[in-house]
């Protein structure tokens, strides 16, 4: 009886300790998602006839050393990427770097439809955002540039070639749209246990079919891809031939291109080598592949 009593007491104590530990773990990271020490300013700008709404987050003292203009990856992202950006933004703010991010076209308070945009459209939008920030910090030492992820790899090079950012940071970007699709699908087939020979044949067949629909002389017939919504089909039609190769050597400002060696979306080895080759004449370039890191 006494042993049973103590076992119940110990079990209850263990449960309380577990709950307390979980509460401590989760609440200790809540500050990563709050901007209590930041100064927030709502800003709007116009691109391609769309009014776009965003937020400029400033360090608590209101005087940043730099401003990072955020370029989203794929998907219907708001200015905070459904709060997924918040820990990163707080890290930048703690380092004295302000952040400007806006709702994608048609998301949140922004007009338009992001699925109707080409990568060139997105680059034009990025330049408009950069120009707005540069006007706010004219005749100051504040450094202003781009910071983007994944699909931003097709946006930032074009934007940086058309404007004068102080820096560009590209994380997990691909150079060629078709090559990225082949890499991504090839890994999926490998995970399914298909042989290298089968994968090669499947990828060749898919490439030919995609070229027939989305290529330069493709049919552009949405009926041939019933798995896509009309908007998504239009997005792929506009971007299927995207290739950052011509723009990368023309980028202005310092360039930092970063990949994770274990990226399952983008071929880190191939794309980092391409950046090194294309930017070999730019002394203000750094290309890094982090081991044991993903997309």
Regions picked out by a protein language model, each given a short descriptive name:
Residues 77-88, 104, 269:
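The serine-hydrolase catalytic nucleophile loop
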Residues 89-109:
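Conserved alpha/beta-hydrolase
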Residues 253, 267-278:
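Short alpha-helix in the alpha/beta-hydrolase fold that links the catalytic acid
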Residues 251, 257-259:
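Short beta-strand/loop motif that positions the catalytic acidic residue
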Residues 64-73:
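Short beta-strand element of the alpha/beta-hydrolase
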Residues 169-250:
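Accessory cap/linker subdomain of secreted extracellular hydrolases
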Residues 116-137:
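Alpha/beta-hydrolase active-site loop
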Residues 29-62:
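N-terminal cap/lid segment of alpha/beta-hydrolase-fold proteins
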